[in-house]
UniProtKB/Swiss-Prot annotation:
UniProt-recorded Gene Ontology molecular function terms: NADH dehydrogenase (ubiquinone) activity; NADH:ubiquinone reductase (non-electrogenic) activity; quinone binding
Major location (coarse): membrane
Name recorded for this polypeptide: NADH-quinone oxidoreductase subunit A
EC identifiers of the protein: 7.1.1.-
Source taxon at top rank: Bacteria
Membrane topology field: Multi-pass membrane protein
Organism: Delftia acidovorans (strain DSM 14801 / SPH-1)
Length: 119
């Protein structure tokens, strides 16, 4: 394998990093730096903050977010499989059945443990 084949990948990585880093550096170097006490104060619709902005969230919200990500990734895995269903054959079908079985068993476990209850 020739190293010249990796040159486009290296160029792509460098351009991507440049697109992300160059605007940050230019803004830092060329931007005005005028610190002011009003810029560092908390702002809440033109008034001073009435209370601390940090609120405690229930852990169940995080659980719902994690479950959403889990099942969203499930769809991300199933979509390419569905497109290539004819090519993967019986072995691919069996692998997806095992994958779905593991997900369903995990979902039933969470359900039985009461992790999805809001009471």
């Amino acid at each position: 394998m020739n190293i010249d084949q990796y040159l486009p990948v290296l160029l792509f990585i460098l351009v991507g990093m440049g697109v992300g880093v160059v605007p940050l550096v230019l803004g830092y170097v060329l931007g005005p730096n005028r610190p002011d006490a009003a810029k560092n104060s908390p702002y809440e619709c033109g008034f001073e903050a009435f209370e601390d902005a940090r609120m405690k969230f229930d852990v169940r919200y995080y659980l719902v977010a994690i479950l959403f990500i889990l099942f969203d990734l499930e769809i991300a895995f199933l979509l390419p499989w569905a497109v290539a269903l004819r090519d993967v054959g019986g072995a691919g079908f069996a692998a997806v059945l095992i994958f779905l079985t593991v997900l369903v068993v995990g979902f039933v476990y969470e359900w039985k443990k009461g992790a999805l209850d809001w009471d």
